[in-house]
Curated annotation (Swiss-Prot):
Task performed by this protein: Component of the ubiquinol-cytochrome c reductase complex (complex III or cytochrome b-c1 complex) that is part of the mitochondrial respiratory chain. The b-c1 complex mediates electron transfer from ubiquinol to cytochrome c. Contributes to the generation of a proton gradient across the mitochondrial membrane that is then used for ATP synthesis.
Subunit: The cytochrome bc1 complex contains 11 subunits: 3 respiratory subunits (MT-CYB, CYC1 and UQCRFS1), 2 core proteins (UQCRC1 and UQCRC2) and 6 low-molecular weight proteins (UQCRH/QCR6, UQCRB/QCR7, UQCRQ/QCR8, UQCR10/QCR9, UQCR11/QCR10 and a cleavage product of UQCRFS1). This cytochrome bc1 complex then forms a dimer.
Protein's organism: Thylamys elegans
GO MF term list: metal ion binding; ubiquinol-cytochrome-c reductase activity
Membrane topology type: Multi-pass membrane protein
Membrane-spanning residues: 33-53, 77-98, 113-133, 178-198, 226-246, 288-308, 320-340, 347-367
Binding site for a ubiquinone: 201
Name of protein: Cytochrome b
General remark: Heme 1 (or BL or b562) is low-potential and absorbs at about 562 nm, and heme 2 (or BH or b566) is high-potential and absorbs at about 566 nm.
Highest taxon in the source lineage: Eukaryota
Cofactor(s) annotated in UniProt: heme b
Amino acid sequence: MTNLRKSHPLVKIINHSFIDLPAPSNISAWWNFGSLLGICLIIQILTGLFLAMHYTSDTLTAFSSVAHICRDVNFGWLIRNIHANGASMFFMCLFLHVGRGLYYGSYLFKETWNIGVILLLTVMATAFVGYVLPWGQMSFWGATVITNLLSAIPYIGTTLVEWIWGGFSVDKATLTRFFAFHFILPFIILALVIVHLLFLHETGSNNPTGINPDSDKIPFHPYYTIKDILGLILMILLLLTLALFSPDVLGDPDNFTPANPLNTPPHIKPEWYFLFAYAILRSIPNKLGGVLALLASILVLLAIPLLHTSNQRSLMFRPISQTLFWLLTANLLILTWIGGQPVEQPFIIIGQMASISYFTIIIILMPLAGMLENYMLQPKYP
C-alpha cells in the first residue's frame, strides 16, 4: 500500500508543495519571506473576518463601530491591533521579498514574477480600501485625494471618479463599496498566491548563486519547514510587540478624529508603506504626470526581466550592480521619508531628485552595469 500522502488526490498536492518538494540546499533566510507572507495573509483574513462581524459600513456608525470593537468586544482591541499592524508586517515582508527577487535575479522566472507584481498591486489596493473603513479624518481625506487622481484621465476622468464614489463626493455609497472590496480582495489574493506557487513549482526555487541547483536538492520537509518556523516565530514576536506595546505608532493621529468633510487635515499622507509612491506622485507638478509616475513606480517591476543584460543571474558576484542595488534601497528610504514631509523646500527638490534617481537606476544604470560587468569578465589575451 502506497503512503497516503503520495496517493491521495488532495494530500498529494500538499505533499508535492510543502513536504517532498525538492529545494536548493543553499537558500538563505531571504527565502523565508514567501512563507511569512502566506502566514500574514492568513492572519489578516482571520482577524478581518472577526472585525467584519462587528463593523458597520455606514458613515454615521463606522467610526463608533470601530470604537465599540475596541471597548466592548472580547479581545476586540487585540484583534484590531493585530489587523492594523499585520498590514504593516505584510508590507515589510513584501518589500523584502521583492528586494530578494531583484537582488538574486528571481525575476527571470517571468510568470512567477508577473503574478507577483499583480499580487503587489492587489495587496496595495486592499490596504488602501481598508484604510478608509475606520472613517477617521485621514481615512476620508486619503480616499478623497487618491480617488480624485483618476480625474486626471482625459475625457472620462470626472465620470469615472463619480462612478467610483457612487455620488458627487466620498460618502455612504463609497464606504459601503470599499468595505465590499476590502472583504473580497483578500480571497482574490489567495487565489493569485496559489497561481504564484503553481508557476514557482514548475521551475523550482532560485538560489543565492543564481546557478542551476538541480545537482544538489534537498526535501523541503524537515529542513525548510523548521527554517520557516524560526522566521515565523520572529515575525509573530515583532507583530505582537507592535500590537501590544505601541499599536498606534505606525498610524496617523488624525484618524482618531471622526471624518469631517468640512475640515481638511494640515498634512494628508497615506500609511508608511505607500509613502515612497506618494513622494513620486507629488514630485511632478502636473496632475496627469504625477498619476503616470505613480503607476510607473510599481509597473516598472514588470520591465525588469527585459532590462536584464548580465550573463549572470544573481548580483552575488557583481559588485557594480550590488552598489546600484543598495543605492536604490537608500533612494527608496529617502522617498519614504519625503512622502511624510510637507510640500515645501528643501523637501520638494529632494523628492524630485530621488524620483529621478529611482527610475534612472532601474531603467538606465542597472542594464549598463550588467553590460560593463560582462565586458570586464571577458578573457583578455595578450
